[in-house]
């Protein structure tokens, strides 16, 4: 997804378009707590907030969320973009930006679909909801042959938001055999 953002970053609508020199960060609990304090919400659970950032579609302003949640998530994005000379992005934010690019630029999405007649999804048991939503945006209804492989007994990324029933969801979504 990083490569897609780097290539198509200029197609991200304002105010979400990052500069070319954005920096990838890996926030820890303390980083989130610093933001929560500055936003006047010191008791926010950082794991739930991190999951919300990873799963919310852009633009946040158009999502069906409680107003307080929408404002809080938007404030985080603004905080990460605060110093435009050094925008701070996490990999989940990059995922959301790429999904947004594909949603608002059908020609880019079509070019992606035409580039890949087959897609192999390895270790699918560890796919997150955000990753799966990006796969759906890219390939649902495209006629691309998708192959998801993995082993539920080897699922190790539950702590990081890996989907429950990943293969069932894949089978239902893509009418897989």
Predicted segment positions?
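P-loop NTPase Walker
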Residues: 1-14, 110
């Amino acid at each position: 997804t990083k490569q897609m953002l780097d290539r198509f970053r200029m197609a991200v609508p304002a105010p979400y378009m990052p500069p070319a020199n954005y920096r990838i960060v890996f926030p820890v609990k303390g980083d989130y707590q610093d933001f929560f304090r500055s936003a006047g919400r010191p008791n926010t659970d950082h794991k739930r907030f991190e999951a919300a950032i990873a799963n919310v579609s852009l633009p946040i302003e158009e999502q069906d969320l409680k107003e307080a949640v929408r404002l809080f998530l938007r404030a985080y994005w603004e905080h990460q973009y605060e110093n435009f000379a050094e925008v701070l992005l996490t990999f989940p934010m990059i995922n959301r930006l790429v999904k947004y690019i594909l949603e608002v630029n059908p020609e880019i999405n079509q070019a992606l679909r035409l580039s890949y007649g087959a897609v192999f999804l390895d270790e699918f048991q560890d796919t997150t909801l955000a990753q799966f939503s990006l796969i759906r945006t890219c390939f649902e209804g495209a006629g691309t042959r998708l192959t998801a492989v993995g082993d539920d007994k080897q699922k190790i990324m539950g702590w990081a938001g890996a989907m429950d029933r990943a293969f069932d969801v894949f089978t239902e979504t893509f009418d897989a055999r």
